[in-house]
Amino acid sequence: QYCGKDNTRFQSAMWQAMLMAADIPNSHQIVVNGFVTGPGGVRMSKSLGTSYDPRDIAIEYGVEALRFFMLKEINSFEDSPFTIERFKDAYNSGLANGIGNLTSRVMTMATNYEVRLSEEELSMKYYTEEIQDLEFFDINKFINKIWSDLKGLDEYIQKTEPFKKIK
């Protein structure tokens, strides 16, 4: 069960009592997340008029880009800023220029040179320590660790230029 930090009293006490009264099992775990803040550190709120409409962002950039930003850049437990400028920076550096370039390079080499990987090579077994972050709901920490590896791979490909050596 997730709740905002301003709602912990209700979720951890009153809601649990309501569940018990309805003979429904209590929550075993309550994950308390921070606020998403806007310009000036003000908490985003529809009722206060301090939020962006995520549908507008999804229409312009795609829902996956918005999901990427929210999972990678928004801290699971602390307040995190969201501005259109910060979103655009993350979109351009992370998706368009980062993973976009890396995916293009790797897929081109894999297709042109018939690179095949085994199921074991494609598994997440190398990330057993990082997967613990997911078990503790620290999603952005998990993604940032994997993102660091992807960035390292992209830098390695740029530096060694394996596509030139295969020709």
Where are these regions (language model features)?
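Active-site cores that bind ATP or allylic diphosphates and position pyrophosphate for catalysis
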Residues: 1-5, 14
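Glycine-centered helix-coil hinge/cap
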Residues: 4, 61-62, 138
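Secondary-structure transition/capping motifs at alpha-helix termini
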Residues: 19-28, 113
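Catalytic adenosine-cofactor/nucleotide-binding cores of aminoacyl-tRNA synthetases and other
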Residues: 34-122
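Helix-rich, typically C-terminal accessory recognition domains appended to large enzymatic cores
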Residues: 88-122, 126-167
